[in-house]
């Protein structure tokens, strides 16, 4: 088998799929920002982490189930592999129901905890209640895509994302600009778009005869635990930019006010797409890594990891250069004020410094959960926001306020990447003994 060709057949569609998932937030920000202004842009920025939780739950469960599916299938245990498909499907149904009820009835409290007040709280509540009602569409829309990739359908996973994305754009234009439905319209467009992605994914899985709810009751708890054990890392990895978003927004309220929040909204929309591109490399190569791991093909596993690191670094450098050259257009894209756009031009280069380091961390994390090294993947997933929070608590009061909030995110990524290199080297050394 040509490993390089197979690698890109899996990874390119995955990268594009993850890029489109990041653009979902940008689409809402674009239409709302140009319709309502800085207040609408700031509202999306504050409220989006709630949407991200729903999508991250789907991604985590989907990845957890699909990793086990690929490993067991490669080891020749097809029957057991299908139980993880069923287990993941039941988990997505359960979490969808719980999240719908929880978010809908506590949306105002959650938004307040995220830093919303006054007009932002009113607009955010309007947005999030609709998102909550469509939780099942978001969970399944993101949760079925990993299964499609592990069934060999990376191209169809990308097509499913494109269909959802195109629907989201068309409906955002219709609901927000033509009908003037503001935050409600943006939220409705988002959940319908995810619903289209879910529908395409379910049809594909049904055609492949890999859509099942059949699992022995006695095996259900153990299967669910194994799915969640693996899925915790991809859940956290997908959510990590939004954890950073919450932390930065909370402290920016004190140091930079609404202008700083709006500035970071513009930056985060763009930089998160880059982070998702890099995660697309890791998660796109995951089916191959899991298959080689399950089949005991160490050489092919190592080659796949090397390709993933190299390709993610190329993407990181190219993305950083392009964004730097176009940074003056970013604030204008979202209808921000001149002051906010000036802030984006000034601050964006700081965040671009972190991109190559994030490439290392995301591929390392994906490699660990693809090969069932769950503890190591947890360390890389959750150490970054902890380090960032500590740095934000320490540095801004002493070394310049808001500017050190920005730099704290970079320092956290550099430290996390360093840890990932150490863990990867040690893990490789252990396997080679």
Segments (PLM) and residue ranges:
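Helix-terminus/linker motif at the lipid-water interface of multi-pass membrane proteins
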Residues: 23-42, 111-118, 174-181, 242-273, ...
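Transmembrane helical elements of multi-pass membrane transporters/channels
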Residues: 9-28, 130, 141, 164, ...
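Small-residue-rich hydrophobic transmembrane alpha-helices
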Residues: 41-101, 138-157, 263-321, 325, ...
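Short runs within selected transmembrane alpha-helices of multi-pass transporters and secretion channels
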Residues: 62, 131-149, 157-168, 186-201, ...
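Short alpha-helical transmembrane segments in multi-pass integral membrane proteins
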Residues: 1-14, 69-136, 178-232, 289-354, ...
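N-terminal transmembrane alpha-helices
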Residues: 2-36, 49-64, 68, 93-100, ...
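Alpha-helical transmembrane segments and their lipid-water interface positions
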Residues: 17, 21, 25-32, 55-62, ...
């Amino acid at each position: 088998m040509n490993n390089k060709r197979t690698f890109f057949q899996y990874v390119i569609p995955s990268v594009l799929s993850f890029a489109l998932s990041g653009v979902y937030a940008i689409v809402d920000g674009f239409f709302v920002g140009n319709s309502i202004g800085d207040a609408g842009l700031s509202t999306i920025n504050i409220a989006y982490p709630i949407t991200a939780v729903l999508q991250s739950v789907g991604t985590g469960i989907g990845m957890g189930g699909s990793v086990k599916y690929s490993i067991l299938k490669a080891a020749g245990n097809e029957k057991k592999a299908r139980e993880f498909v069923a287990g993941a499907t039941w988990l997505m149904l359960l979490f969808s129901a719980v999240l719908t009820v929880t978010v809908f009835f506590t949306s105002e409290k959650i938004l307040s905890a995220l830093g919303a007040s006054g007009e932002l709280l009113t607009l955010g509540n309007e947005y999030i209640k609709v998102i909550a009602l469509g939780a099942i569409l978001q969970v399944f829309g993101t949760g079925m895509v990993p299964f499609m990739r592990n069934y060999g359908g990376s191209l169809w996973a990308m097509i499913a994302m494109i269909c959802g994305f195109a629907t989201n754009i068309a409906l955002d234009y219709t609901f927000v600009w033509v009908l003037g439905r503001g935050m409600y319209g943006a939220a409705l467009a988002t959940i319908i778009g995810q619903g289209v992605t879910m529908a395409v994914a379910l049809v594909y899985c049904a055609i492949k005869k890999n859509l099942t709810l059949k699992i022995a009751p006695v095996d259900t708890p153990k299967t669910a635990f194994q799915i969640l054990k693996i899925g915790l890392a991809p859940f956290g990895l997908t959510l990590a930019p939004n954890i950073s978003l919450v932390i930065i927004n909370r402290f920016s309220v004190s140091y930079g006010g609404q202008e700083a929040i709006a500035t970071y909204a513009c930056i985060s929309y763009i930089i998160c797409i880059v982070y998702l591109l890099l995660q697309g490399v890791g998660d796109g190569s995951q089916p191959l890594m899991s298959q080689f791991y399950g089949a005991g093909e160490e050489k092919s596993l190592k080659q796949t990891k090397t390709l993933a690191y190299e390709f993610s670094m190329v993407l990181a450098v190219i993305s950083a250069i392009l964004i730097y050259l176009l940074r003056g257009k970013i604030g204008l894209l979202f209808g921000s004020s001149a002051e906010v756009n000036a802030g984006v031009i000034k601050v964006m280069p700081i965040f671009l410094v972190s991109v190559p380091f994030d490439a290392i961390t995301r591929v390392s994390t994906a490699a660990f959960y693809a090969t069932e090294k769950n503890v190591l993947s947890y360390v890389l997933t959750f150490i970054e926001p902890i380090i960032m929070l500590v740095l934000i608590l320490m540095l801004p009061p002493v070394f310049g306020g808001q500017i050190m909030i920005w730099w704290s995110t970079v320092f956290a990524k550099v430290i996390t990447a360093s840890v990932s290199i150490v863990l990867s080297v040690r893990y490789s050394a252990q396997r080679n003994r």
